[in-house]
């Protein structure tokens, strides 16, 4: 028998949410960085003067991992069953928070990678496409921000299942 009030399996789901947030968002960041980085390298052969201007998708993809880190830290600081009760509701709230942020980051990373790869290659041939590429990348990044916001809201719901 455990020595804390609450459910014994609840912290498992909470930590699973923290891991999901970090793992999935970093997978999206890695995919976006790799895919758009290949496009930058390919474009750099044709137009080396545009390389620094074309690393915007790589930077935007890298930011996605930070969103997952933020949610993972918020979740993990909320899990302390020794000081206060941690119930299944809390674990599920943290799991859903991590999945919302992580899967949104994964999908945004895929979008940034594909758009960034095609965008920097097209920018080498037609510089007028740069603004359009940046706008599309911003909308893809907004997907991850939506996941971050929903993740923060869901993780703040943990602890509201009871009156203490």
Swiss-Prot record:
Residues 33-54, 117-128 are cytoplasmic. The record marks 141 as: Essential for proton translocation. GO terms for cellular component: membrane; proton-transporting V-type ATPase, V0 domain; vacuolar membrane. It is found in: Vacuole membrane. InterPro entries: ATPase_proteolipid_c-like_dom (IPR002379), ATPase_proteolipid_csu (IPR000245), ATPase_proteolipid_su_C_euk (IPR011555), F/V-ATP_Csub_sf (IPR035921). Keywords: Hydrogen ion transport, Ion transport, Membrane, Transmembrane, Transmembrane helix, Transport, Vacuole. Residues 1-9, 76-94, 155-164 are lumenal. It comes from the Eukaryota. Pfam families: ATP-synt_C. Its main location: membrane. V-ATPase is a heteromultimeric enzyme composed of a peripheral catalytic V1 complex (main components: subunits A, B, C, D, E, and F) attached to an integral membrane V0 proton pore complex (main component: the proteolipid protein; which is present as a hexamer that forms the proton-conducting pore). This is V-type proton ATPase 16 kDa proteolipid subunit.
């Amino acid at each position: 028998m455990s020595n804390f009030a609450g459910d014994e399996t609840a912290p498992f789901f909470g930590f699973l949410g923290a891991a999901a947030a970090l793992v999935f968002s970093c997978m999206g960041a890695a995919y976006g960085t790799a895919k758009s980085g290949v496009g930058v390298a390919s474009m750099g052969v044709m137009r080396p003067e545009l390389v620094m201007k074309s690393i915007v998708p790589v930077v935007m993809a890298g930011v996605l991992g930070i969103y997952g880190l933020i949610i993972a830290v918020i979740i993990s600081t909320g899990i302390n069953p020794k000081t206060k009760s941690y119930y299944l509701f809390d674990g599920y709230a943290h799991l859903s928070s991590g999945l919302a942020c992580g899967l949104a980051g994964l999908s945004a990373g895929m979008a940034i990678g594909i758009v960034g790869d095609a965008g920097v290659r097209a920018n080498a041939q037609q510089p007028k496409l740069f603004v359009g590429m940046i706008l599309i990348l911003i909308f893809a990044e907004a997907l991850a921000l939506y996941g971050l916001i929903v993740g923060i809201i869901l993780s703040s719901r943990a602890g509201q299942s009871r009156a203490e």
